Curated annotation (Swiss-Prot):
Source lineage: Bacteria, Pseudomonadati, Pseudomonadota, Gammaproteobacteria, Alteromonadales
Family listed: Belongs to the AspA/AstE family. Succinylglutamate desuccinylase subfamily.
HAMAP family: Arg_catab_AstE
A Gene Ontology BP annotation from the UniProt entry: arginine catabolic process to glutamate
Protein name: Succinylglutamate desuccinylase
Cofactor stoichiometry and binding remark: Binds 1 zinc ion per subunit.
Length: 351
């Protein structure tokens, strides 16, 4: 922490506009700290990384990240509003909270990323022998450090959670859905499904292998209840119908401003769960899908229907109802171009 007070502190106290401050300092911002009248300690760790420590002892350490992809604006707007409410003293926290705007430069240019997809660089994938560093790789390494530091300073026995908030490139038959990272054999939690349902998310995709995502990092390294949460479709700033995110914002607010949040009793019938059937990577320059760019996530295919063509290799649906998630024919060679999923039931692997 710098011994001198950064120039931006007084303006931030007045406006609460940490988003604009971060956008004006795309890759670095000097650390700073101040205390609100209600006793909450505000710590700016870097551009896009701000921590709130309530005056009272907390039982949860909560991370909300957005702008890991800079053009996914609805989650950015939600987090911007929450940060402003906290700094204005309108929202009194009961739990420690770390807010992250992942990639401020990509926000400014209105694209998913600048040089490289940030959400392919976590869990150590930012530093690979023979691969030169760039701003996004450096940023991923720093974000891991900030999350590690935040969790390490929590109260002993505190629960840890990280919700990485996104919107999807294309529409979805299930507008909002979450990705539950691979837990390496540990049970899934019904309580987390209840939290997601309270956010307006009743569709959950269960991953079956390690990943390079921010949410997998927090789950695997820190044991956090962690999810990638897709809240709808990508739209420019000012074009989001924020009423569609009211339940999400209310639930995110309650988690950090209440000692304990009560959710409705668990009912398996309220959820649609899917498990990954397979991953299709792009390995050739010539890669295409037979469906249009308007094809929605969770669109199902009949057994034998063409799903993708990678060079001379066709991929056909090999089970009835095999559904597509995150199709993107423009990914870099070697990266995932498509996930396919099949329905699953809530079973004994849930607690």
């Amino acid at each position: 922490m710098s011994a001198t007070t950064p120039d931006y502190i007084e303006e931030l106290k007045q406006t609460g506009d940490f988003l604009t401050l971060s956008r004006n300092n795309e890759w670095h911002l000097a650390a700073g700290e101040f205390t609100l009248n209600n006793g909450t300690v505000v710590t700016i760790h870097d551009t896009g990384v701000i921590e709130f420590q309530p005056a009272t002892v907390s039982s949860k350490d909560v991370v909300y990240s957005s702008a890991v992809h800079g053009n996914e604006t609805a989650p950015i707007e939600i987090c911007d509003e929450l940060i402003k409410q906290i700094i204005a003293g309108e929202l009194l926290l009961k739990q420690r909270a770390l807010f992250i705007f992942g990639n401020p430069q990509s926000i400014n240019i209105g694209l998913r990323f600048v040089e490289e997809n940030l959400n392919r660089l976590f869990n150590g994938h930012h530093s690979v022998d023979g691969v030169p560093m760039n701003n996004e790789r450096t940023r991923a390494a720093k974000l891991e450090q900030y999350v590690s530091d935040f969790f390490s300073r929590g109260e002993q026995g505190s629960s840890r959670c990280h919700y990485d908030l996104h919107t999807a490139i294309r529409g979805s038959k299930n507008e909002k859905f979450a990705v539950y990272p691979y837990l390496h054999g540990k049970p899934w939690k019904k309580s987390q499904l209840q939290f997601l349902l309270s956010c307006g998310v009743n569709t959950v995709l269960m991953m079956k292998s390690p990943a390079t995502t921010f949410s997998y990092y927090s789950s695997f390294v820190h044991g956090a209840d962690s999810f990638t949460v897709e809240l709808g479709q990508v739209k420019p700033f000012g074009e989001n119908d924020m009423s569609r995110f009211a339940k999400t914002k209310q639930t995110l607010t309650a988690l950090i401003s209440q000692d304990k949040v009560e959710y409705p009793e668990f009912n398996a019938d309220e959820f649609e769960l899917f498990t990954v059937h397979r991953t299709i990577n792009r390995t050739q320059n010539e890669f295409s899908f037979p469906f249009s760019d308007q094809a929605e996530n969770f669109t199902g295919f009949a057994k034998g229907e063409l799903l993708a063509t990678d060079g001379d290799t066709p991929y056909y649906a090999d089970v009835q109802g095999e559904a597509i998630i995150f199709p993107n024919a423009n990914v870099a060679i070697g990266q995932r171009a498509l996930l396919t999923v099949v329905p699953m039931a809530i079973d004994s692997n849930f607690i």
